[in-house]
Amino acid sequence: MKNLLTIASLWLLSLSLAAGQDASKTSSLEDQIKKLEQNWAQATVKEGAAAVDQYEADDIIATDPSGRVTNKTQDKLDLSSGDFKIQSEELSDVRVRIYSNTAVASGTNIVKGTYKGQDINGKYRFTDTWVKRNGKWQVVASQYTKVQE
């Protein structure tokens, strides 16, 4: 009986240690995705179309606040043509959920910029889906909604 209690205690201890490691790993991945979100926003302002190649997957599906669905090629064209001009992006309240090699990030973005000459300044809510492929995190889906204030 004493051996059974010892074995059960060791088993429970190993489970709690494993759970702690999983929580630590998840927290680290959440921080990594938050950093990628910040980097993507900054790169879009500084690098324009070059940021698309770095952060967007080839098969991305993106929906803008008007409901227009775009892909990587269209996003690059919008930025390189000057149709989409971003002066600043300020992310806040970014929350991340990890699902194995997939992460979902949601937050707020204060944008200053124009699209085809129209002012798009404002507060937006976003949801981005990141997938880790070949050791690299990239966005496969992105959706922005303008917050009505």
For each feature predicted by the language model, list its residue ranges.
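A beta-strand edge to alpha-helix "cap/lid" segment located at domain peripheries
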Residues: 4-7, 21-55, 59-149
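Bacterial N-terminal signal peptides
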Residues: 7-16
